[in-house]
Amino acid sequence: LDYAHTTPTYGLPGGKWVMAALTVDDGIHDDGPVMTTAFEYKDGKRDRHEREFLGFGEVITKNLDTEKGNSVYRQAVENYDVANYYTQGNVTATSVEDANGNKYTETKNRYDSYYLTADGDKYTFAKRDVNLWSDRASAFVPLRYTANLQYEGAANGVVTSEAWNEYYLNGYHGELKSYKYSDKGSLGEDGNGKFDYATAIKYTGNASKHIFGLPVDVTVTGGDGSLYHHVTAKYNTNYANHITQITQQLNDGEAVTDYKYDSYGNIIQKTLPANGKGQRMWYKYRYEPEMNMYVERIDDAWGYRSEQGNFDYRYGIAKEHRDLNNFYYETDVDDLGRITGVRGPNELATGVPYAIAFEYQPLATFGESGITAPAYAVTKHYDIQHPNDDLETVTFVDGFGRAVQVKKDGVVTSASKGNSAKDENVMIVSGRNVYDAFGRVAKAFYPTTEGTGSKSTFNKSFDNVSPTVTVYDVLDRATSVTLPDNSTTTTAYTVDNGSHALVTTVTDALHNVQATHTNGSGKTLKTIQKSGPDGEITTSFEYDGIQRLVRVTDTEGNVTASTYDMGDRRTEVNHPASGITSFTYDALGNVQTKQTANLAKEG
C-alpha cells in the first residue's frame, strides 16, 4: 500500500491522506507480473458549516501495466455528488476509459431531492430543485434515472438501457411506486418517453407496529399497454415479514401459493398452486429445538419425508441425513467448518470410512522468490476395487486463492516402436497459465503428466507445445485467441446506433465471419453469417417488453412466432413448416394439453 497527501484546495483546506497505489502479488512469480492499481482524487469537499468531510467529487482508479513500465492501461472514473451533506456519496456517473481517455462504457445517475417532515410515522415531502441547505431538516434523495451507455472508444456513446423510478411521497414513506425500463434509448431523464415495460407497486403496513413498505400488488405492463404480470400478496401484518399468500394472475385463472409460520418466524408449511385436478402439493418444515432455525425434517403431501440432525451449531451444518428413500448418509466437519468426509448408505453398511474425503493444507511456504509450496486441498474418492489406493484430486491455489493447478489420478496408455500398449499410472497435471498484468489468462499451456510420488508438490513445469495465447481489450473481452497451431480467431466490438445494440464480430481461422447484435438487456437481436457461399445469412430475433422471444425470422423471411400467457408459459408456437402448436397448462405450470397443426385438422 502507498499513501499520499492531496493538494489543499478551497473546497478541501488542508488536503487529505489517501491511498495512492495498491500492488498485489499472488506469490507465484513465474506465471505473470504483479498487479498495480493507482488512485487519483479530485474535487474534495469539506462542509465548513457541518465541519465534516463529504468526500471527493471524482475518483480515478488506474490499472497500470507493470509489464510496460507502469504505464496506464485503463482507468475507471467515478463521479460523486459532494454539493451538500444530504447528497454526499451519491454516484452521479461512472465510466471505463482506455489510457487515452476514450470511453468504452458509462453509467449516468440522476437523483431527486426532497425535504422531509415527519410527524411520528406520517411523512411529508417537499421537492427541492436546488441544493439542500438546512440546520434542522431531514432530506430524501432517491435515485430517479439511470442510463447505461456503450462507447467502444468512439466519441459519442449509444444508450443501451435506461431505468426511471417514481416514489410514493406524502402519506407514505418513500417506497418505490413505479419503475420503467427501456433498452432502446427512448425513455429519457423525465421518464416520459417510450418504455419496454413499467412496474407499478402498491404497499400495505401496520402503523400501530411501525411496519411499512410491504408490497401487496405488483403490475407489469408493456409500453403498448399489454398486461404482462399481475401478482398480489397477503401478510400477517403483526410481523415485519410474514407473507401468507402470493397470487399470480393467469389468463384464465390464478396461481395461489400459501405460507404458514411458527412463533419464531420460520416457514412451517408451503402450499403450491393447484394442479389440473385441484390437488395442491404442500411441504411442511420442522426445525431443531436447540436454535429453532435449522430445518431438521421436511414432509410433503405424498407422505415422503427427509430428515437431518446432529447439527454442528458453530456453522449450522447437519452431520446426519436421511433422504426420501430412507437412506442415510453422514458428513464430517472440522473445527473450521470445512467438510472433511461424506459417507453414503453403502459406506455406512460396509464400514468404509468415506465415499469422499477432503484434506486441507491452507498454509503456503515462502522463500525469497515468493511462494515455494502453494496451499492446496486434496479430494479423495474411495475406490472399492482398490481400497488402499484412493482416486485423488489435488488443487493448488496462489496467494489470491485462485486455483492455479489441478492434479488427478489417471492412467496413460502408450505404445512405441511396435510394442504393445502399456498402461501407466500417473498424475495428470493441468496446464499452467500465465497471467497478464491485470490477472487475465494470457497464455494457457497443455496438461502434462508426472509420477504418482509427488502428488502434494506443485509442478512448476510448462508443456513444450506452444500455448493458447489470448489478447484482451480494456473491458477484459477476448479480442484475439491464437491456438498452438497458430490458427487465430479475432473478435471486434462496435455499436449500432440504430438498434442501440452491441455488435460482436467474430472472424475464425478460416476467415468465416459472423456478427451478433445484442441489446442492452443481453438478448440477441440479430446474427449475420457474412461469409456464406450464397452471401449473408441473417437471422433476426424480436422480443416483447419483458424480453420474451416472440418472433424469429430467418434469412428467407420465414417467421416463427410465439405467444405467452401471464405466467410466462408459451401457449402457442407458429412454425412455418409445422404450423401452429398450442399448449394449455394448469395453475401449477404442468402441461395439460398439446395440439399440433395435424391434430387440429383431425378435430
Residue ranges and their predicted role:
Residues H5-L12, G316:
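Extracellular hydrolytic enzyme modules, especially secreted metalloproteases
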